[in-house]
């Protein structure tokens, strides 16, 4: 009888090195000190498995965790100690705020109405929850405007509140160090300090942590950097923290003129050896995956042929002699996450966030 792990591995194996995640966190925390270093684990920890990653980071003294949705917050709250703050970046609707209080989950307040509702709710409680407000300094996504934040200062004074615990904003171009908007957004955050001089402030995401030290403020929020995703200009090396391997389902030699895949977008112009691989776009393999990306067999690159299917895709294995059941690397040493993303005209974030539930996930312990 097959074990569940063997059944799941039939699609592919996603191996997460928790020791590397922890090492990256500690490296980043040292880099931004004395600022506090949190951890962004939205989208199931960027597709890798937040419920295993969060406790490992907590053991490494991370005490503030960011997710996007309420369901993600509940999942983390259930496994983290009470002294860990769980913050919802998307905030919540007013009707969900009492539930957040009961669950010790902190929504990031993204409008004046949300701030007013949250303050009123806390004033009726014996134990007040933290107040975190998002400032829209240049994303035009979520948060109060600078003008609204200035008006909120008067409201706080009228209601007897000193200040929000945190005012948080988000850089729109942190991956472009010389972009003028970075300076503009930082300037708006400095102006916010006139209204709330005693609040703590947060601006830097993964890339923002490697801009000028002033951008680090009181709290930094690394996300993909925890998993080794870095820009070439980062001053501190990070460790890749996961690999994804797939399985060859079939190997077939085909003659000239053989159509391959949906839409027959590729027709062979020479005899080829085609290998069919065990995952597809239902598992997060981008449908628009293009050569030179594909898979790697013992370090040899096998480029994709034709369109990725829902549950499989084909590669050119003419240079080797693989067999059905062989394990091939999709993300790892021989084909990096960044190379896969570039071949799909996207970013590493998207590739990670789309990693599917059908993969077997192996968590290598941080103690190893």
UniProtKB/Swiss-Prot annotation:
Substrate binds at residues 141, 310. SMART domains: Ala_racemase_C (SM01005). Keywords: Isomerase, Pyridoxal phosphate. Its EC number is 5.1.1.1. It comes from the Bacteria. The active site is at residues 42, 262. GO terms for cellular component: cytosol. SUPFAM superfamilies: Alanine racemase C-terminal domain-like, PLP-binding barrel. Its cofactor is pyridoxal 5'-phosphate. Pathway: Amino-acid biosynthesis; D-alanine biosynthesis; D-alanine from L-alanine: step 1/1. One of its GO terms (molecular function) is pyridoxal phosphate binding. The modification N6-(pyridoxal phosphate)lysine is found at residue 42. It catalyses: L-alanine = D-alanine. One of its GO terms (biological process) is D-alanine biosynthetic process. Catalyzes the interconversion of L-alanine and D-alanine. May also act on other amino acids. Belongs to the alanine racemase family. This is Alanine racemase 3. It comes from Salmonella typhi.
């Amino acid at each position: 009888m097959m074990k569940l792990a063997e059944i799941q591995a039939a699609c592919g194996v996603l191996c997460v090195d928790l020791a590397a995640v922890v090492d990256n966190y500690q490296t980043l925390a040292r880099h931004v000190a004395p600022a506090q270093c949190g951890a962004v684990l939205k989208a199931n920890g960027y597709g890798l498995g937040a419920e295993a990653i969060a406790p490992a980071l907590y053991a490494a003294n991370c005490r503030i965790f960011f997710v996007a949705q309420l369901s993600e917050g509940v999942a983390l709250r259930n496994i983290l100690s009470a002294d860990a703050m769980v913050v919802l970046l998307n905030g919540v609707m007013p009707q969900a705020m009492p539930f957040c209080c009961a669950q010790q989950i902190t929504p990031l307040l993204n409008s004046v109405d949300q701030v007013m509702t949250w303050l009123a709710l806390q004033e009726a409680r014996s134990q007040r929850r933290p107040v975190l407000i998002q400032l829209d300094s240049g994303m035009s996504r979520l948060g109060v405007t600078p003008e609204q934040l200035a008006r909120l200062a008067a409201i706080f004074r009228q209601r007897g509140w000193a200040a929000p615990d945190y005012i948080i904003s988000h850089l729109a171009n942190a991956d472009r160090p010389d972009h003028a908007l970075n300076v503009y957004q930082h300037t708006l955050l400095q102006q916010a300090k006139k209204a709330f001089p005693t609040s703590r402030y947060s601006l830097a995401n993964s890339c923002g942590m490697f801009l000028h030290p002033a951008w680090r403020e009181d709290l930094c929020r690394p996300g993909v950097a925890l998993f080794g995703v870095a820009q070439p200009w980062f001053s501190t090396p990070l460790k890749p923290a996961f690999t994804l391997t797939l399985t060859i389902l079939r190997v077939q030699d085909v003659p000239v003129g053989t159509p391959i895949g949906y839409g027959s977008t590729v027709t062979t112009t020479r005899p080829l050896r085609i290998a069919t691989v065990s995952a597809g776009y239902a598992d997060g393999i981008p449908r628009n995956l293009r050569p030179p990306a594909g898979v790697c067999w013992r370090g040899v690159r096998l480029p994709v042929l034709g369109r990725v299917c829902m549950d499989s895709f084909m590669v050119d294995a003419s240079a080797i002699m693989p067999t059905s059941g062989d394990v091939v690397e999709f993300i790892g040493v021989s084909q990096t996450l960044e190379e896969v993303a570039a071949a799909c005209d996207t970013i590493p974030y998207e590739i990670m966030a789309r990693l599917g539930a059908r993969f077997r996930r192996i968590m290598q312990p941080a103690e190893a």
